[in-house]
Amino acid sequence: MEHAFTPLEPLLPTGNLKYCLVVLNQPLDARFRHLWKKALLRACADGGANHLYDLTEGERESFLPEFVSGDFDSIRPEVKEYYTKKGCDLISTPDQDHTDFTKCLQVLQRKIEEKELQVDVIVTLGGLGGRFDQIMASVNTLFQATHITPVPIIIIQKDSLIYLLQPGKHRLHVDTGMEGSWCGLIPVGQPCNQVTTTGLKWNLTNDVLGFGTLVSTSNTYDGSGLVTVETDHPLLWTMAIKS
């Protein structure tokens, strides 16, 4: 069975996907307000609350997350105090074997189940800038998330989006008008031994993708508005978002 998905649909004013929003500990950009407004449930992972607090000065009561989770080594004391006073759920997750992002997803999935929400995707803001080790930790969380939630997860920061394709066939609709010029398929963790695509300028036909051999970066679209990908192992899809 093919999995059909429009990665940039949450950014569209007319988008119909039902999503939850996770704010990580990195600067927020202009897309934040639109995504916040339409989210079914909103959460901050530890220091993500600092960025939310700073960005919404003068209107903070309109931007209260359902919960803030983490080991609370990054959230500033005044930020923690503010959201506590406003009735937000502050959930301590001290486990050092997992990142605050991973632990936030665990809490989020429990909330989704408790509220019996129908969720199409989890949109995450941040996680793709700054320190390289933290970027790779974000990618690792996408792999871990398959054991946490059945809901697909996208990570967005500035002009980049990543989404982990599971083994099988995928139809990615790239006709929203918000797509930038580049895209890529990156075999993180292990080689993908059979990858076939359509809709790209440089397509693959039963090709092996792997570090040390071939990695499909700086690819682009053929103009059809649809990309299909078939892979035998998890494969990271990345794409540009128009500024």
Curated annotation (Swiss-Prot):
Arranged from A to Z, the UniProt key words for this protein are: ATP-binding, Kinase, Nucleotide-binding, Transferase
According to UniProt, the tissues expressing it are described as:
Detected in kidney and liver, and at lower levels in heart, brain and testis.
Q: Which reaction does it catalyse?
A: thiamine + UTP = thiamine diphosphate + UMP + H(+)
Q: Name one Pfam family in it.
A: TPK_catalytic
Q: What are the GO cellular component annotations?
A: cytosol
SMART domains xref list? TPK_B1_binding
Q: One GO molecular-function annotation for this sequence?
A: thiamine binding
The answer on whether this UniProt entry bears the keyword Coiled coil reads no
What InterPro entries is this protein classified in?
Answer: Thi_PPkinase (IPR006282), Thiamin_pyrophosphokinase_euk (IPR016966), Thiamin_PyroPKinase_B1-bd (IPR007373), TPK_B1-bd_sf (IPR036371), TPK_catalytic (IPR007371), TPK_catalytic_sf (IPR036759)
| Domain of life per record | Eukaryota
Give the EC number.
2.7.6.-
Q: Which GO biological process annotations does it have?
A: regulation of acetyl-CoA biosynthetic process from pyruvate; thiamine diphosphate biosynthetic process; thiamine metabolic process
Which pathway is recorded for this entry? Answer: Cofactor biosynthesis; thiamine diphosphate biosynthesis; thiamine diphosphate from thiamine: step 1/1
Function, in words? Catalyzes the phosphorylation of thiamine to thiamine pyrophosphate (TPP) utilizing UTP and therefore links the biosynthesis of TPP to pyrimidines metabolism. By producing thiamine pyrophosphate, a cofactor of the mitochondrial pyruvate dehydrogenase indirectly regulates pyruvate oxidation and lipogenesis. Although it can also catalyze thiamine phosphorylation using ATP and CTP in vitro, it does so with significantly lower efficiency and without physiological relevance evidence.
Q: How does it assemble?
A: Homodimer.
Which protein family is it in?
Belongs to the thiamine pyrophosphokinase family.
**Which NCBIfam families does the entry mention?**
thi_PPkinase
Q: How is this protein named in the record?
A: Thiamine pyrophosphokinase 1
